[in-house]
C-alpha cells in the first residue's frame, strides 16, 4: 500500500481501511508501515500490532547488525550484509565515499564479527555495532582507528540506538516503524537500518 497524493485527499483513511480489511480477512498477510507522521500508530496498537518508535531517546532498539540465514534471498548473507555495513559506515562517517583501504578494513571486520554467529547457523545472539567497533580497534591500520573514532558517537555515544540488541518484535504480522522523532543526525542512518530490518524480515 503506497500512501501518496495531495493533502486532504483521504489517503490515510483509505490506507487504514484497506489495512484493517487485510488483517481481518487474510491470516497469511503481513503489513509493514513506515510512518513519518505518526498517523498509523493508534490503529496498529488497537489491532495488537507492534509500534516501533525510532529515535535517539527511544527505549525501542533495532540492532543494525541483525541477520538471519535467509538474509538476501539465498546468497551468502555475510557478503550481502557487508555491503549494508559499508553503506552504513559511509553515513556514520558523514556521508562521504569510503576509500579502498577503508572498504577492505570494514569488510574484514564484518566477516570477523559474524564468524561465530555464522558457524552457529545464525542462531543465538548476533553481533552489534559495538562489537564491530571493538573489532576495528584491534586492527593495526591507522585507517581502522580513524573509522572506529568516527563511528563512536553511534556505537558508544548519545546516538547509539542502533548499536544495541533488538528489543522489539520485528516478526509481528502488523508492524509500524514510527520515525516522527528521528532527528536530522539519525535520519539517513535510521532509514537505512529500518529498510534493512524489513529486508531481513521478508527474505
Per-region residue spans from a language model:
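P-loop NTPase motor domains
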Residues: 1, 38-50, 54-58, 63-203
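Glycine-rich phosphate-binding loop of nucleotide-binding enzymes
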Residues: 1-55
Amino acid at each position: 500500500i503506497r500512501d501518496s497524493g495531495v493533502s486532504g485527499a483521504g489517503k490515510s483513511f483509505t490506507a487504514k481501511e484497506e489495512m484493517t480489511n487485510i488483517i481481518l480477512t487474510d491470516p497469511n498477510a503481513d503489513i509493514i508501515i513506515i510512518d513519518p507522521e505518526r498517523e498509523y500508530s493508534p490503529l496498529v496498537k488497537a489491532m495488537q500490532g507492534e509500534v516501533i518508535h525510532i529515535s535517539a531517546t527511544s527505549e525501542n532498539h533495532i540492532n543494525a547488525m541483525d541477520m538471519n540465514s535467509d538474509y538476501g534471498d539465498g546468497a551468502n548473507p555475510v557478503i550481502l550484509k557487508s555491503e549494508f555495513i559499508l553503506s552504513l559506515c559511509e553515513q556514520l562517517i558523514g556521508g562521504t565515499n569510503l576509500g579502498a583501504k577503508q572498504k577492505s578494513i570494514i569488510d574484514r571486520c564484518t566477516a570477523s564479527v559474524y564468524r561465530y554467529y555464522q558457524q552457529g547457523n545464525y542462531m543465538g545472539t548476533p553481533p552489534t555495532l559495538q562489537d564491530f567497533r571493538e573489532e576495528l580497534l584491534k586492527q593495526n591500520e591507522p585507517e581502522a582507528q580513524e573509522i572506529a573514532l568516527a563511528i563512536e558517537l553511534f556505537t558508544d555515544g548519545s546516538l547509539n540506538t542502533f548499536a544495541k540488541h533488538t528489543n522489539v518484535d520485528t516478526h509481528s504480522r502488523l508492524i509500524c516503524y514510527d520515525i516522527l522523532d528521528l532527528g536530522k543526525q539519525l535520519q539517513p542512518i535510521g532509514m537505512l537500518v529500518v529498510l534493512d530490518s524489513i529486508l531481513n524480515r521478508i527474505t
